[in-house]
């Protein structure tokens, strides 16, 4: 019989810390390419971008946790890690509040980044926040359709790597777009593997992911 975690541990698990590598690696790759090109690293933009990316990832994870619970897709027979809302460790309202709080912290990081990088960062930041909510928190979640991999490729590859490079150099180059493409493919592959694991449960609950359609 599984033992339920305490409240702090429940929040820790709900944030899904293992997924943070997927959101932080694009920031590091973009910064590494910028370092190669410019010979320097701007540490404050790097740290703000890393924390902002992590908070968006955590907020998206929490929206996913409560969204899947409310839509009935997190059933007792699902494979993979146990989910905080579905298991009753945390209330749906509390998890949703945690998601918005995480997005608010990401927004605060974005204020500094906008001061440094200007209007392009406004577009990147707002699009990233909207996408994080829409992935599973919106009325028609992206994760419930066949475009999840495309979404992840764009935001974890092109946007995150390119944006991190831009924060360091205030320019863009073909080389960083190539690096962004490679990182995006890797991130999309993570979603593909995850959806393959959840194939049977997704099919029963009406999630038409690319794996289910194929």
Task: Map each language-model feature to its residues.
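Small-residue-rich segments of transmembrane alpha-helices in multi-pass membrane proteins
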Residues: 21-30, 150-165, 211-214
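Topogenic membrane-insertion module of multi-pass membrane proteins
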Residues: 1-44, 48, 139-140, 152
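Membrane-embedded alpha-helical segments that form the functional core of polytopic membrane enzymes
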Residues: 29, 38-64, 122-127, 174-193
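Alpha-helical transmembrane segments of integral membrane proteins
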Residues: 9, 18-22, 44-48, 97-98, ...
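A cytosolic-side transmembrane-helix exit/cap motif
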Residues: 63-70, 141-150, 170-176, 196-203
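Solvent-exposed interhelical
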Residues: 63-103, 109, 188-214
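Functional transmembrane core segments of multi-pass inner-membrane proteins
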Residues: 152-199
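Intramembrane alpha-helical segments
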Residues: 4, 81-171
